[in-house]
Amino acid sequence: DADPRGELDLSDAVVVLDEVCRTCDADWTRSLMQRAGRVVCRNLGQVVIARELGVTFDVAAPVFCANRATLTWLRGLGAGRVYLPAELLGNDAERIAELAAEPGVWGPVDADRPELMVCEHCLLTAEGVCATDATGQVRCRDCLRRRQVRYLVERDGTRLPVAIDACGRTRIFLS
């Protein structure tokens, strides 16, 4: 949520980048990559930027690594660590054992709260008009609705937690 011009020292940090990287996010992403000790790329566009900048990077879902061929390809691109996707951990013990035997293969980035989906658009627009500033510009970071606890209720009554970030991206979680 901070301004990229704040230039915090992140040299000792591992920065896990967002799954979505819009064109308008490129400068912010580059700034984070240049200041971070290491970054975790969550899409191939970020991998391209990391390679251009020559920074140390890892790869995690939604970039899906489910076999040795993909692992070899990601390593060939320069990935130091590869995080296995949470979906794989629940389904295929044999494949996990094979991949986990390789150096630099880790479990999922966030196994405690697995995401079902990331939507590039804000689902709160279904409730009404977005928050705007004095000039009429939409300001997601100032939206009071996004700070409230929200759930998507499925037909069977299952309540899926929903979070909206400061850029208006919606995340729906499994639990």
Regions found by a protein language model. Name each.
Residues 1-175:
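Active-site pocket-lining/capping segments in soluble small-molecule metabolic enzymes
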